[in-house]
């Protein structure tokens, strides 16, 4: 028996490779599937099944392409209604994989079709639970994503409680838990940084599995403090349900080297967005006018999904050398399939062609402190709501302007004003500054090091509130 977790940090997502006697099952594959095929071929094994725990919202799964390339069967739990060929399993249905068995446990709540997959060893002993977004380590999946018709988030939360109590808690303590996500995912509120656990420990430490918790208490607690989902979640879920373009075609389309003239022509004629994915320090030093910064050194794909509202948006890339294919791949993981190419030679090519270059003013926390004390300045704190509430600068002209909702809140800022922008460490503030600049805000200043550096000055702060109490 082979079980491999294939974890993708940028998405905080775990896919799984299971092998027994030459037969392979893949659970929740990523969009690019060649790695799974290569693993199986290396072991002279054949991919037999592709198990999907639900219609994922935070990434585009590779189930459709993997099935086309291997002939493997796609399997969903009860009530799933995909627009492609798949086996819709019954609750408790068992699938044979070599000497192993995989049992479908229908666990509605995160979504109505959500299911866990219980792996039994060759002695038919419960060995591992592939829990999808039903159970994370330290948390459970948010129950607000699949509301429709007369099914409310409270209904879904109630279903989730019953699924956990009737299908998960009843399993033995030594069952290994393999969740679909870890810390950093927006599919839950407080996921552990660990990506593999044991069910007995979760019964002791996970608030959602407390033995003394009533259904009403669970519903209240699991819904408390859930931030609105990123705008791309519903769109990715629909792609996973309806099907999508072949990843190989998407990569071929986007992996095109363009000289400065062709790059500029495409930007103008195709209304393409110029996306600069270099490190923020490089963007600060020089960038193409009206380009947007979202660096691949940070939470790239989720921020793209949160901020670029049209999945069909034509995109042109400015990347670090050698990162072109990786960038196209990471865009496709969240459904952005319309990359038209990249600037060959990067920003140096643009400069050599005599094209216009802009910079972003960036100052130290110490310099910012002097301005804050001696002038009336406008400060934008672009951190998340919980970060801001925990502690922030205390001042009349300090404005919370969360990057997550910058598109919705543009009317809260004035293009005639000068804004000093900070986040926690200096990544998100540059994203926000680039968006504002592209929309005609000519006077934006980044505070290098963000709130982490500002805290080391003597500027006034609000009293710290532990985030766990918010």
Report each predicted region and the residues it spans.
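Active-site neighborhood of phospho(di)ester-bond hydrolases with catalytic His/Asp-centered motifs
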Residues: 26-27, 47-56, 74-79, 106-109, ...
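Rhodanese-like catalytic fold shared by cysteine-dependent sulfurtransferases
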Residues: 142-144, 150, 201-238, 242, ...
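Divalent metal-coordination and catalytic microenvironments
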Residues: 18, 28, 54, 66, ...
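Active-site metal-binding motif and surrounding structural segment of the metallo-beta-lactamase
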Residues: 33-75
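Active-site metal-binding loops of divalent metal-dependent hydrolases
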Residues: 29-30, 55, 79, 111, ...
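Short, well-ordered beta-to-alpha junction loops that form the rim of enzyme active sites
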Residues: 179-184, 189-190, 235-237, 277-279, ...
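Conserved beta-strand hairpin/beta-sheet module of binuclear metal-dependent hydrolase folds
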Residues: 1-46, 117-132, 137-138
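Metallo-beta-lactamase
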Residues: 101, 111-229
